[in-house]
C-alpha cells in the first residue's frame, strides 16, 4: 500500500504563479530549517510512509544553492527508509544535483507552453505535469494539453487538480469532463487531505493544520 508523507517546505518563493493557495489564503507555513528535519525519520517510521513528497509553502527549489545541506540531510533520511520520492516545482530550467535522486518530478504548469520546457534529465525518472483548473479553462484547453502529453517523450503523466479559492473552498470547474477522463487521459485530483503532512518537526493530517498558529 502506498502512503505518502508530504514534506511542506518554505525557503521563500518567486510568487509568480497566477494563483497560490498559500498566499491567497494567508497560510503561514513555518520557515524551513535544518533542525526542522530532526523528527523526519520518526514521522516516516511512525506513520509507516513509503513515499515522501516535497512541496511548498514556497517552491522547494527557491534559492536551492543556499539549502544544499537541508536537501542532503532530507534525502539521506528518505534513502535510509527506502522511500520513493517526488519533488513538486514550477522551475523548468533548474535541475540541481540532488534532483537525480527523485523518482518523480511534478512540474506545476500555468499554460500549455510550459509543457515545451519539460524534458527528461534522467531516464529512470518520471515527469508529471500538473495544472490547477481555473475558471477560464475550457474543455478544448484540457484536450489540447492531453494531446500534447500523449505525444511527448518527456512527459510521462498528466494531472489536473481543482482550485482552492480565497476562502479555502474547493471549486469544481469542468468537474464532470475531468472526472470522465480520469485514469484514461489524465489523473483528476479533487482537493482533499490525502497525505500525512510534515513541516519543522510537526506532523498533521490536514494541510491547513501545518500552518503556524
Residue ranges of model-derived segments:
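Auxiliary Fe-S-binding modules of radical SAM enzymes
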Residues: 1-2, 160-213
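Conserved glycine-rich "GG(E/T)P / GGGxP" loop and the immediately following alpha-helix
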Residues: 23-152, 156-162
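Canonical Radical SAM [4Fe-4S] cluster-binding loop centered on the CxxxCxxC motif
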Residues: 1-35
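Generic structural signal for short, flexible, solvent-exposed coil/loop and linker residues
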Residues: 2, 6-9, 41-43, 50, ...
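Bulky hydrophobic/aromatic packing residues
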Residues: 21, 99, 201-203
Amino acid at each position: 500500500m502506498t502512503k505518502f508523507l508530504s514534506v511542506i517546505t518554505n525557503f521563500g518563493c518567486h510568487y509568480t504563479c497566477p494563483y497560490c493557495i498559500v498566499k491567497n489564503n494567508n497560510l503561514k507555513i513555518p520557515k524551513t530549517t535544518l533542525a526542522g528535519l530532526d523528527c523526519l525519520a520518526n514521522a516516516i517510521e511512525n506513520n509507516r510512509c513509503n513515499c515522501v513528497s516535497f512541496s511548498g509553502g514556497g517552491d522547494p527549489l527557491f534559492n536551492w544553492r543556499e539549502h544544499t545541506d537541508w536537501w542532503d540531510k532530507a534525502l539521506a533520511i528518505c534513502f535510509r527508509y527506502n522511500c520513493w520520492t517526488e519533488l513538486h516545482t514550477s522551475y523548468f530550467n533548474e535541475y540541481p544535483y540532488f534532483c537525480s535522486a527523485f523518482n518523480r518530478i511534478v512540474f506545476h504548469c500555468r499554460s500549455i507552453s510550459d509543457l515545451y520546457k519539460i524534458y527528461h534529465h534522467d531516464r529512470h525518472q518520471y515527469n508529471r505535469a500538473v495544472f490547477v483548473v481555473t475558471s477560464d479553462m475550457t474543455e478544448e484547453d484540457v484536450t489540447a494539453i492531453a494531446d500534447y502529453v500523449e505525444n511527448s517523450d518527456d512527459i510521462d503523466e498528466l494531472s489536473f487538480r481543482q482550485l482552492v479559492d480565497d476562502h479555502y473552498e474547493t471549486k469544481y470547474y469542468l468537474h464532470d469532463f475531468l472526472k470522465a477522463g480520469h485514469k484514461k487521459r489524465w489523473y483528476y485530483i479533487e482537493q482533499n487531505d490525502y497525505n500525512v503532512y510534515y513541516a519543522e518537526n510537526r506532523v498533521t493530517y490536514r494541510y491547513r493544520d501545518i500552518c503556524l498558529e
